[in-house]
């Protein structure tokens, strides 16, 4: 593990401070470069379009996510947003990930 992150949008009052963005920055800082083509990014829920764009720009080698996001997920709005060489694995522990996200947002409200 070269980087870990979580959503900091409320803490930083920054709508771009999603966990994926934080993790990409952390990994790039550790590696000393902006390309993550030999890295795997694991996330609880499908990235949004903004995060998918960052994942593409970082040329992330693999993306693994649990729950799909039917409202804001990149697949709904920009299915081709990721780098063409990025391997996508979806549905890993999907039910558990969906429950985590439901609890997370319930605590925010």
Task: Give, region by region, the residue ranges found by the protein language model.
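A short, polar/charged loop-to-alpha-helix boundary motif
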Residues: 8-25
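A structural microfeature
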Residues: 2-3
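Immediate flanking context of iron-sulfur cluster ligation sites
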Residues: 33-46
């Amino acid at each position: 593990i070269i980087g870990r992150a979580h959503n900091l949008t409320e803490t930083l009052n920054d709508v771009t401070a999603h966990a994926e963005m934080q993790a990409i920055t952390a990994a790039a800082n550790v590696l000393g470069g902006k390309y993550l083509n030999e890295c795997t990014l694991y996330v609880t829920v499908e990235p949004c379009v903004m995060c998918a764009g960052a994942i593409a720009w970082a040329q992330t080698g693999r993306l693994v996510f649990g729950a799909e996001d039917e409202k804001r997920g990149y697949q709904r709005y920009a299915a081709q947003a990721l780098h063409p060489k990025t391997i996508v694995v979806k549905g890993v522990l999907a039910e558990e990930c969906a429950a985590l996200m439901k609890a997370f947002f319930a605590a925010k409200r």
